């Protein structure tokens, strides 16, 4: 049977979207709700906030830094067995964490082992999804990533309820059971049968071309800065509210308010990304700027109504930037290099995920509150949005819409030419 030269823009791709939906929920929904466990770990181990912050920080960093491994394995063996293996590792890490007697045990179990499992699930799934869609890519990505918002809405109060009934050890056992569902999600993945382009080259040739691709490198710097501040509210907002004398349950509920807005933001952003003409980078820059501003305003808000309003604004804008961050990548490098490109991008931006939470915790320990933590986090996002201005076609307002072929080929400001790539699917 002849292979397609263009993505089907549907078909089994919608099953892949469903799989990605649950995977994003079980990976980032857990990470975003980990602020509920943060307070428990500080009390249980009698450690400073900066040291406890390393648990989630290591998990985020390993998930992103290990993404090239997941991408390379998916290129060789396909995404299905790789993602299923990742689900087993993620569940095993949470299981071992329930027996932890020190922070080092949590660093190794949640940070290293579960983080490795997440690295094998997220990037291969999104790369597989990108190969199924072209015209509807932003919408499909937005729908897939709504799992993050939906799970954040449900997981934060659910985890708080678990802690009140089973303590943190029993709660981690149940989180381990939830993580096993990643195995079922991986079983649904099936790459489309697209005609191969031998001119693209193997993994080494693709990696070399990307490392000399100016727009791609600038984009990774921008996302690294964004990633440094992006997760701070999900880790420290509950603790910040408790410093303002909020009870634990209402504080966890505010994370659910953020999650609902995040959910709406992802869907709206995915629709706008496909509907608005021009590069998706412009919309990404808009949402990133608004997210940075709302982050910096958190310490200013004191009244409950102001905090709820700010949580709604932050949730919507932070959710809106997420699907576009992945939709921009195929515009820059094409879909033929998406496995390698997405893995490399996740690895480089892991630097931000590694440094952001401990820096925020350190500022809390030094200053005695989270004011500096939120202001600095907002500054990182604003810096990243500034770098997005340098990407190709950002200021191009021609009435003639540039196709993805133009976006890829004209973006190459490198001395090492990229292999020619058939981009008819874009």
Curated annotation (Swiss-Prot):
It holds the Pfam family MFS_1. The keyword Transmembrane applies. Keywords: Cell membrane, Diabetes mellitus, Golgi apparatus, Membrane, Symport, Transmembrane, Transmembrane helix, Transport. GO terms for molecular function: monocarboxylic acid transmembrane transporter activity; symporter activity. It is found in: Golgi apparatus membrane; Cell membrane. GO terms for cellular component: cytosol; Golgi apparatus; Golgi membrane; plasma membrane. It comes from the Eukaryota. InterPro entries: MFS (IPR011701), MFS_dom (IPR020846), MFS_MCT_13 (IPR048233), MFS_trans_sf (IPR036259), Proton-linked_MCT (IPR050327). It is linked to Type 2 diabetes mellitus: A multifactorial disorder of glucose homeostasis caused by a lack of sensitivity to insulin. Affected individuals usually have an obese body habitus and manifestations of a metabolic syndrome characterized by diabetes, insulin resistance, hypertension and hypertriglyceridemia. The disease results in long-term complications that affect the eyes, kidneys, nerves, and blood vessels. Proton-linked monocarboxylate transporter. May catalyze the transport of monocarboxylates across the plasma membrane. Belongs to the major facilitator superfamily. Monocarboxylate porter (TC 2.A.1.13) family. This is Monocarboxylate transporter 13. It comes from Homo sapiens. The gene is SLC16A13.
């Amino acid at each position: 049977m002849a292979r397609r030269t263009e993505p089907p823009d549907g078909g089994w791709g919608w099953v892949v979207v469903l799989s990605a939906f649950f995977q994003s929920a079980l990976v980032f929904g857990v990470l975003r709700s980990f602020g509920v466990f943060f307070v428990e770990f500080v009390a249980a181990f009698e450690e400073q906030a900066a040291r406890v912050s390393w648990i989630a920080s290591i998990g985020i960093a390993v998930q992103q830094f290990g993404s090239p491994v997941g991408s390379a394995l998916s290129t060789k063996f396909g995404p299905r067995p790789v993602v299923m293996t990742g689900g087993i590792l993620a569940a095993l890490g949470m299981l071992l964490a329930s027996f932890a007697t020190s922070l080092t045990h949590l660093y190794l179990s949640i940070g290293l082992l579960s983080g490795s499992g997440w690295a094998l699930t997220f990037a291969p799934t999104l790369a597989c999804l990108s190969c199924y869609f072209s015209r509807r890519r932003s919408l499909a990505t937005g729908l897939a990533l709504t799992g993050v918002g939906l799970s954040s809405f449900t997981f934060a109060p659910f985890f708080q309820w678990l802690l009140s009934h089973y303590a943190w050890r029993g709660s981690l056992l149940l989180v381990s059971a939830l993580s096993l569902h990643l195995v079922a999600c991986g079983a649904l993945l099936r790459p489309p049968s697209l005609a191969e382009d031998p001119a693209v080259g193997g993994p080494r040739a693709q990696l070399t071309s990307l490392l000399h691709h100016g727009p791609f490198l600038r984009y990774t710097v921008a996302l690294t800065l964004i990633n440094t501040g992006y997760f701070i509210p999900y880790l420290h907002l509950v603790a910040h509210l408790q410093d303002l004398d909020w009870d634990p349950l209402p504080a966890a509920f505010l994370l659910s308010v953020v999650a609902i807005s995040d959910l709406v933001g992802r869907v709206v952003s995915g629709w706008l990304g496909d509907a608005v003409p021009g590069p998706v980078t412009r919309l990404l820059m808009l949402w990133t700027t608004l997210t940075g501003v709302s982050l910096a305003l958190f310490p200013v808000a004191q009244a409950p109504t102001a905090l709820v309003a700010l949580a709604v604004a932050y949730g919507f804008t932070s959710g809106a930037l997420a699907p576009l961050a992945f939709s921009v990548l195929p515009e820059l490098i094409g879909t033929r290099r998406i496995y390698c490109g997405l893995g490399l991008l996740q690895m480089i931006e892991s630097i931000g995920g590694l440094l952001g939470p401990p820096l925020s915790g350190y500022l809390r320990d030094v200053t005695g509150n989270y004011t500096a933590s939120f202001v600095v986090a907002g500054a990182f996002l604003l810096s990243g949005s500034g770098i997005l201005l340098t990407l190709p076609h950002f200021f191009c307002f021609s009435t003639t819409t540039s196709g993805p072929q133009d976006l890829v080929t004209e973006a190459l400001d490198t001395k090492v030419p990229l292999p020619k790539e058939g981009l008819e699917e874009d």
